[in-house]
A protein has these predicted regions:
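Short beta-strand-turn/beta-hairpin segments enriched in glycine/proline and small hydrophobics
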Residues: 1-11, 28-44
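Secondary-structure boundary/capping motif
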Residues: 14, 31, 44-53, 65
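Short histidine-centered loop motifs in beta-beta connectors
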Residues: 8, 14-18, 22, 51-54
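Short, basic/polar N-terminal leader/transit segment immediately after the initiator methionine
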Residues: 3-7, 50, 66
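Surface-exposed, flexible loop/turn segments at secondary-structure boundaries
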Residues: 20, 37, 57
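Short hydrophobic beta/alpha edge segments that flank linear recognition/processing sites
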Residues: 24-39, 61-70
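ATP/adenylate-binding site constellation spanning eukaryotic-like Ser/Thr protein kinases
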Residues: 6-9, 46, 54, 62
Length: 70
C-alpha cells in the first residue's frame, strides 16, 4: 500500500477520485487550494484507490495522509 500525503498546508478543494477507482501514475486524485493557488495531488504509481481520508473543504497539514493506494 502507498500513502499519498499532502506536501503543503491547504484545504481540499475538489476530490477527483473515489475508492475502487483504477488510477495510472500521475493521475490527479484530488486538488488542494493554498494561497489562492490550486495544487493537484497525483498518484505516485498505478494502482487502486483503497481509501480517501479527507473530504472537500477539509484543512490539511503538511505530511497528512490524504489517500491510500493499493
Amino acid at each position: 500500500m502507498t500513502e499519498v500525503k499532502a506536501e503543503l498546508v491547504g484545504s481540499v478543494w475538489k476530490i477527483t477520485s473515489k475508492p475502487g477507482d483504477q488510477v495510472a501514475e500521475d493521475d490527479v486524485l484530488l486538488i488542494l487550494e493554498s494561497m489562492k493557488m490550486e495544487i493537484s495531488v497525483t498518484a505516485p504509481r498505478a494502482g487502486t484507490v483503497k481509501e480517501i481520508r479527507v473530504k472537500e473543504t477539509d484543512v490539511v497539514k503538511e505530511g497528512q495522509v490524504l489517500v491510500i493506494l493499493e
